[in-house]
């Protein structure tokens, strides 16, 4: 849960709101640090106020278990956190090549909570979308006619059950979803899942992100909001022109692109990557971008 990325400079804590770590009544927080073959010299942590002006607690030279790929760190926080208040967790990692790498996450004390129940619900709903269980997802959708029912690139809680369960497209999930909490309160859990699927009929792959907002009660869990964004994963060398037009396939939004003066090369950004398409050579090229971190 909650993938975090390292920074080599101090960051503004108030803006580091990509994810939230919830602390249960045992005050334990487990962290797994992927080493990427780095030689790690020390690990320390701080819990600060969101504006970073006040140090709540900290610890140096943390003990860790090394399994070869990950360094596993377990924090037992002091009983200093106020329930419902947000703090900033800063994990500091010193390596042989880099003096200090910092990882940031919002931290909130939940005490007794039902976050795992909400996660289980989201995973069940997610499985229903993949297995084509239209009747199952229909129980939680709020169809109101605002969605056209044809676009698989973007669907939400107001969509019909057909598009939510991928319509006629046969999909298989690749690997496990990456889960991130974006909001944690006493009875509210908001999370995202990111994963890839394959269209098994035409062997195309798609990057998918789902967002859930859930409310737990003693009798049931309510799906308050649901969205899904799907984008075809582009591959260098693939042809994009169909009937003289660029065809990007399933996309969550229309790509923005620019042409050169001769109008024979098109550049566009898709999924954080810069691509170019040469009409003359009918060839797609990745100009700049990162994948898998």
Predicted regions and their residues:
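Short, surface-exposed charged micro-motifs
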Residues: 180-181, 211-213, 265-266
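Structural recognition of the beta-propeller blade-terminating site
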Residues: 49, 215, 278-280
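Exposed beta-sheet edge and beta->alpha loop/turn motif
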Residues: 82, 188-227, 232-236
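Contiguous hydrophobic, core-forming segments of folded domains
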Residues: 66-69, 74-98, 104-114, 120, ...
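Core segments of small alpha/beta cavity-forming domains
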Residues: 2-45, 55, 86-168, 244-283, ...
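Residue-level signal for tight coil/turn positions that link beta-strands
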Residues: 186-188, 218, 263, 271
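Surface-exposed, charged secondary-structure patches
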Residues: 14-30, 41-70, 74-91, 159-203
């Amino acid at each position: 849960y909650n993938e975090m990325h390292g920074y080599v400079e101090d960051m503004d804590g108030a803006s580091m709101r990509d994810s939230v770590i919830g602390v249960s009544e045992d005050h334990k927080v487990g962290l797994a640090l992927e080493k990427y073959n780095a030689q790690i010299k020390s690990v320390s942590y701080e819990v600060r106020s969101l504006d970073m002006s006040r140090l709540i607690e900290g610890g140096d030279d943390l003990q860790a278990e090394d399994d070869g790929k990950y360094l596993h760190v377990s924090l037992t926080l002091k009983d200093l956190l106020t329930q419902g208040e947000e703090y900033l967790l800063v994990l500091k990692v010193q390596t042989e090549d880099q003096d200090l790498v910092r990882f940031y996450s919002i931290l909130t004390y939940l005490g007794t909570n039902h976050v795992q129940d909400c996660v289980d619900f989201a995973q069940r709903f997610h499985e229903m979308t993949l297995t084509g269980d239209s009747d199952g997802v229909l129980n939680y959708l709020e169809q109101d006619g605002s969605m056209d029912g044809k676009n698989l690139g973007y669907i939400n809680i107001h969509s019909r059950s057909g598009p939510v369960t991928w319509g006629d497209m046969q999909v298989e999930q690749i690997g496990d979803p990456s889960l991130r909490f974006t909001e944690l309160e006493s009875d509210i859990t908001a999370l995202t899942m990111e994963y890839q699927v394959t269209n098994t009929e035409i062997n195309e792959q798609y990057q998918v992100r789902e967002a859930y907002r859930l409310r737990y009660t003693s009798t049931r869990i309510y799906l308050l909001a649901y969205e899904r964004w799907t984008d075809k994963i582009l591959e260098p060398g693939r042809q994009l022109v169909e009937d003289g037009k660029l065809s990007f396939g399933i996309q969550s939004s229309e790509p923005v692109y620019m042409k050169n003066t001769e109008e024979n090369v098109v550049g566009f950004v898709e999924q954080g990557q810069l691509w170019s398409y040469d009409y003359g050579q009918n060839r797609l090229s990745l100009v700049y971008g990162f994948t898998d971190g």
